[in-house]
Design a protein with these regions (language model features):
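Alpha-helix C-terminal capping segments
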Residues: 40-50, 285-288
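Conserved post-catalytic alpha-helical subdomain immediately downstream of the catalytic base
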Residues: 262-328
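Conserved N-terminal subdomain of the carbohydrate kinase-like
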Residues: 50-137, 321-335
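A short helix->loop->beta-strand "cap" motif at the edges of active sites that frequently abuts
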Residues: 157-162, 228-231
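Positively charged, low-complexity intrinsically disordered leader regions
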Residues: 1-22
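Beta-barrel outer-membrane channel/assembly domains of diderm bacteria
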Residues: 11-17, 39-46
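Conserved phosphate/ATP/ADP-binding segment of small-molecule kinases
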Residues: 173-255
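Short pre-catalytic strand/loop immediately N-terminal to key active-site residues, enriched for Gly-Thr
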Residues: 24-34, 259-273
Length: 335
């Protein structure tokens, strides 16, 4: 039976000043749609996986445009709820040279932010599903959404599904204290956790300095697995090596052992969605029974390729990821 993946979260309208302009000087915005779990669903659909996305969007034409942006890549949209008045928006000022990325959210009062538990029939949504994925951004939206996530996780576990969560801490959405309280409840149901150093510090106040010589990502993973019943913790990190170049590497920790990917050195076109692409690569690897080393290489390569694709969605194929992960084909002209 083919795996059926369900992802859950908020898709938003992303507005970015053209030509790397600042907010204060732009006269036009580039508009695309995206959001953590939507990005993961699109990546999986491009990998020929049965990927389904659940959210709530207004009935007007902008809500429909967001749905169309998913449907065109083969994402299942049958369980998207329609209602409310607004779609969430985020304004993105892209990193350029030494100038950092700046994100401004305009999502309060969106259809998804005002969604209630009655909007989502998890028995129907999870019919024949094998995997449920969401991120820590979703429960951060409201107390109601925290409870909805818990209900969804409980139902997924009842049905024998695998549950994965990208912790994805956002300090602009909630405090460390509130994040810790909510995610501590949610993580009791999670099998596969994706977390980096910032997540561990921001949510659970972990201190990598306590690693005593152990590689910090492995230390964080091991400590998280002491707190929660995770079967696997994965992490991906990007290190700036110069003003224009970055290094990407990732790790999978499972059954007491850390597995590291090779490093990629890269220039960045658009890094938004790179973590979501990693999640998709990891889910694809696990549903196809890749061993941990193959899984970490595939997931890291998927994330690397997202840095070359404009917009939130990672529009690459399994073949492209495989060639980058396991050969030098990425340096050749594909004829």
């Amino acid at each position: 039976m083919k795996d059926k993946i369900v992802t859950f979260g908020e898709i938003m309208l992303r507005l970015s000043p053209e030509n790397n302009a600042r907010f204060t000087q732009c006269n036009a915005f580039e508009a695309v749609y995206g959001g953590g779990e939507a990005n993961t669903a699109v990546s999986l659909a491009n990998f020929d996986v049965d990927a389904n996305y659940v959210t709530k969007l207004p009935k007007h034409i902008i809500g429909q445009a967001a749905i169309n942006s998913l449907r065109q890549y083969g994402v299942g949209v049958d369980h998207i709820v329609r209602g409310g008045d607004q779609i969430g928006i985020y304004f993105l000022e892209k990193k350029t040279s030494q100038r950092p990325t700046n994100v401004i959210y305009n999502r309060a009062g969106s259809a998804f932010a005002l969604a209630t538990a009655d909007d989502f029939n998890w028995d129907e949504i999870f019919d024949c599903a094998t995997w449920f994925h969401f991120s820590g951004i979703t429960p951060a939206i409201s107390d109601e959404m925290t409870n909805i996530c818990i209900t969804a996780c409980q139902k997924a576990k009842e049905k024998g599904m695998t549950v994965s969560c990208d912790l994805n801490y956002r300090s602009k959405l909630w405090s460390s204290e509130k994040a810790c309280e909510a995610m501590s409840r949610i993580c009791q149901y999670v099998d596969v956790c994706i977390a980096n150093e910032d997540d561990a510090i921001g949510i659970f106040s972990m201190n990598p300095a306590d690693a005593n010589g152990e590689e910090k990502n492995a230390y964080i993973a091991r400590e998280l697995m002491k707190k929660f019943p995770f079967k696997m913790v994965a992490s991906v990190w990007r290190t700036e090596t110069s003003i224009t170049t970055f290094k990407l590497q990732s790790m999978i920790y499972t059954e007491g052992k850390a597995y590291y990917s090779k490093e990629f050195f890269m220039h960045i076109l658009d890094y938004i969605g790179a973590g979501d692409a990693y999640c998709a690569g990891l889910i694809y690897s696990l549903i196809n029974n890749f061993d941990p080393q193959k899984a970490v290489e595939f997931s890291n390569a998927a994330s690397c390729l997202k840095h070359t694709v404009s917009g939130d969605y990672n529009l690459v194929t399994v073949d492209e990821v495989m060639k980058l992960a396991f050969s030098d084909a990425g340096n050749e002209v594909q004829r």
